[in-house]
Design a protein with these regions (language model features):
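A short, charged, Gly/Pro-tolerant segment at domain boundaries
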Residues: 260-261
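Flexible "cap/lid" subdomain of the alpha/beta-hydrolase fold that forms the substrate-access gate
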Residues: 29, 36-68, 72, 76-226, ...
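A short, glycine- and basic residue-enriched loop/turn
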Residues: 10-11, 79, 230
Length: 261
């Protein structure tokens, strides 16, 4: 299983889920994605377009010699996972998306649902030059710390902030928002077996897009709603996420290596 993190987090957001998967005998890998890893931090905004992020995951599978993988993502990681599954269904056995619905459903909600439109206002702010870096890094990252609240474990918060306070890292992470393009919302429906997990207490993602998510999955689809939890589902409800991934893998096993060349 490849586990993809979102903003403003790192691979550490998946630590407990990965441990639970390992206990179940399932190997996983959680990379620090483009911009978060100092070895993959281009400076051009165009280098953070969705197709580039998708290419990173396909390249990672190639590097590991994996023809097909189980894919899970949270927040921005969910958007990348949806896009990988839509563009490369031959490489994805199952998809588990957490918090963010299919990008087309999310785009519809931002345009048509006043609540979601208001909740998504931060995305426009994050796309501005310079100002969001100043706001998020000010006063020892107090805005980020408040956003995590007491849900995200202290050691994970420390790791996220260690990464994001490195020179150029916050700008690189925010470039994901600056590189957004309307065409990125027009990805195809997903055909692979999919589980979507959402918490009704998520202050960033509201119900309108969630309820349309299944319209964009033509393969087997399972929806799990967690009552009143936060946006930080992998940290707050790791057993729910790990169990959902495990159940889906058991129903649709594969994770095949690439054939010899």
């Amino acid at each position: 299983v490849i586990l993809l993190h979102g903003f403003p987090e790192t691979s550490a957001s998946w630590s407990t889920v990965a441990d639970l998967l390992a206990t179940a005998g399932i190997a996983s890998y959680a990379p620090d994605q483009r911009g978060y890893s100092p070895g993959a931090r281009p400076t051009d905004i165009a280098d953070y377009r969705l197709q580039e992020l998708v290419g990173d995951i396909v390249g990672l599978c190639d590097e590991f010699g994996l023809e097909r993988v189980h894919l899970a993502g949270h927040d921005w990681g969910a958007i990348v996972a949806w896009a990988v599954a839509a563009a490369h269904p031959e490489r994805v056995t199952t998809l588990t998306a957490v918090s963010v619905p299919h990008p087309a459903a999310f785009a519809w909600a931002r345009e048509n649902d006043p609540d979601q439109r208001e909740r998504s206002g931060y995305m426009e702010f994050f796309a501005k030059p310079d100002e969001p870096e100043q706001a998020l890094l000010a006063d020892d990252c107090v805005a980020l710390r408040l956003g995590f609240g007491d849900v995200v474990p202290a050691d994970a918060v420390a790791e996220h902030l260690r990464v994001l306070t490195a020179p150029g890292a916050m700008t690189a992470a925010l470039n994901w928002y600056r590189a957004m393009d309307p065409a990125d919302q027009e990805i195809a429906d997903v055909t692979v077996p999919t589980t979507f997990i959402w918490s009704s207490g998520d202050i960033a993602i509201r119900r309108a897009g969630v309820e349309r998510c299944g319209q964009h999955v033509s393969g087997p689809y399972r929806y799990i709603e967690i009552p009143d939890g936060s946006h930080w589902v992998p940290e707050e409800f790791p057993s729910v996420v790990a169990d959902a991934i495990t159940v889906q893998i058991e129903a649709y096993p594969s994770g095949a290596p690439l054939p010899p060349r």
